[in-house]
């Protein structure tokens, strides 16, 4: 399991305090508004907006909040956010991609550069590490939604590239070009997924020792806590022992 997936699992197990929950809702609302502003305000016709709405539902964001974020885009009274991708190397030379929506480029760049530097890494230029990742669609379902064989058969029939099934659920991967069609076909068969989004999937992962792993998780925690940061991806793996320690 790639480091960013391990990190998200740890954060989920730890649960969210009210302040963290509020920050999560704020980030989700920002993504919903931007997605609705860039495309149609109808989630059925706007894959990015649909992905954002699904993510919001998974976080138990109130329906009123979701609708308000969409209406904000329609009304034209929303702030203007720039979409920026930051790339760099974290501790141990691990490649890291940060996706942000910001209304202040200088502030965001300064903050994110500081996080990388303090962790022992360095922020690079756009394109410096993204060649080590694939821009891929992922559709996730809970394990109880289908057997591994049924999910695999349905995914292949829909045109997916790969399927990973475990006790934690099913992950279906599809190219950018086929993502929307695959997601639509699976939803017709299994219902709404718990996640459907475009991600940066590492082509290969690097196993790091526990000391480096802790530094990387700390870097990712700082990045994720920043108001402008939407997603963080990295190409590392850590031991099960460190996973258990960080989740404890």
From Swiss-Prot:
Localization terms from the record: Cytoplasm
Location of region: Disordered: 1-22
Keyword terms of this UniProt record: Cytoplasm, DNA-binding, Transcription, Transcription regulation
GO biological process terms on file: regulation of DNA-templated transcription
GO cellular component, one term: cytosol
Major localization listed first in the record, in broad terms: cytoplasm
A GO molecular-function annotation: DNA binding
InterPro entries the record matches: Integrase-like_N, TACO1_YebC-like_2nd/3rd_dom, TACO1_YebC_N, Transcrip_reg_TACO1-like, Transcrip_reg_TACO1-like_dom3, YebC-like
Similarity field: Belongs to the TACO1 family.
NCBIfam families: PRK00110.1, PRK12378.1, YebC/PmpR family DNA-binding transcriptional regulator
Name of the featured protein: Probable transcriptional regulatory protein RPD_4171
Species name: Rhodopseudomonas palustris (strain BisB5)
